[in-house]
Amino acid sequence: MGSEDNQENYQLRYYIALSAPPTRTVADGREAFMRPEPGFNPSWFHKHCGVDFSRRWHTDVKYRLQCHEAMSKEVRRRFPGSNIGGIDDGAAPDLLTGLYGIAVVPAMFGSSIQYFCDKWPQPQPEPLTDEQADVLSPPNLRDNEFFQGILGQLDQIEKVTGAARGYLNWQGVLNTAFRLRGDKIFTDLFDNRQRAHHIFECVAATMIDGTKLLHDRQRQAGVDEKFATISNCVVNMISPEQYSDHLLRYDLKIRGEFDKFGIHNCAWVVDPYMDAYATVPRLGYLDMGITSDLKRARKLFPATRRNVLYTSIDLANKSDEQIRNDFEHIAADFAPCDVGLPDIEIDVPDSRLMFAMDLCKEFSDRYGDN
C-alpha cells in the first residue's frame, strides 16, 4: 500500500497536450479535488482546424508549431477560460508530447509507421518469428536513427519555443511486447516463458535507457524530469496471477530507476490487478474505469494521485442525470482525483464537455472540504 507521507513529492497527474495521446506530468499539490483533464482526438482538430496529422506533423517542428497555434485558438474560442491542454499556463508550447504516438518504442526496434490525416500513427511491425524473438536485443539508442531524429527535433523545439518540454509515449512492457511479437507473446507465457521474458527484458531496458537519455537532453535546457510512467492497456489479456508472476517485476524494475512513477491502467475495471499494483513503492499515479471498485481503490492507494477515465462514448450517450450521478459517485467514493476526459470525438457537443467540467467544479466545492 502506498505511503501517505510527502504525497505531493511523488504524485503525478493526468496530462493531455493538444491533439496528443494522454500521458502524465508532475503534480504540484494544488490540484482541485476533482480536476478535469479533457483531450480531443486528432479527428476533432482535423475537422475544426484543418490540421493534417500525417507524417509532416511528426517530422516538421515549425509545422507542428503552426498547428499548435491554430488548435489553441480554436480551443480558446470554444472553451474560454478552461485552460484545456494547459494552453493558458504561460508555458512554452509543448511540441514534443504526441510525437509518433504509441509507435515510439516499436520504431526504435525497426518497425515502420503508418500515418493518418486524422488519427494518431500506428506501428506496423512484422511479428517477430521464434528465431527473431530469441535473438532480439535492445537497440543502441545512441546510434539509433529514429531516436536520434527525435533528439534532433528537440533541438529545433528548443530553438523555436525557448524550451524543451514534453514527453514521449513509452507505452508499457506488455503493450510493446504484444506489438512486436503479436498474439504469440501470450502463448509464449505458457509454451516458452524464457522467450517471453527475453522480449520483456529487451523492452524494459529500452524504455529505461530511452527515458534517461531524453531526460539528459532536456536537463541541458533546464527541464529536469525525474519520472517514468507505463501503460498497461493490454494487461487484462493476461490473468492477475500472470501479471504478478511475469510482468510486475519489469514494472518494478522501471519504477526503481526513477524518482517518481505512475501506471496507466486504461478505462476498464482495475479490480483484479489492484493488489499487485499496491506493491509498487510510492506509486504516484493510477487510473481506471468508472466501473472499478472506486472505494477500494481509494483505500488501497491513499497517497497515489488517482484518475477515473470517463469515456467519450459515455460523455456523448449518457443523459445529464446519468453523468451527474457518475460524477457524484466519483466525488463521494474516489476523490481527490483527476477526472480524465480523453479521446473526445466530433460527436461530443461542446456543451456536454462544459457540463462535465462544471460538475467537477460543483462537486469539488461540495465535497472538497469534507
Model-identified regions with their sequence ranges:
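Active-site loop segments of alpha/beta catalytic cores
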Residues: M1-H58, R64, P139-N370
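Short coil/loop linkers at secondary-structure junctions
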Residues: D52, A103, S112-Q114, A164
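A gly/proline- and charged-residue-enriched helix-loop-helix capping module
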Residues: C117-G152
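Aromatic- and acidic-residue-enriched carbohydrate-binding clefts of CAZyme catalytic domains
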Residues: S112-E131, I230-M237, L309
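Intrinsically disordered, low-complexity extracellular "stalk/linker" tracts enriched in Gly/Pro/Ser/Thr
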Residues: P21, V105-F116
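Membrane helical hairpin/interfacial module
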Residues: W57-G110
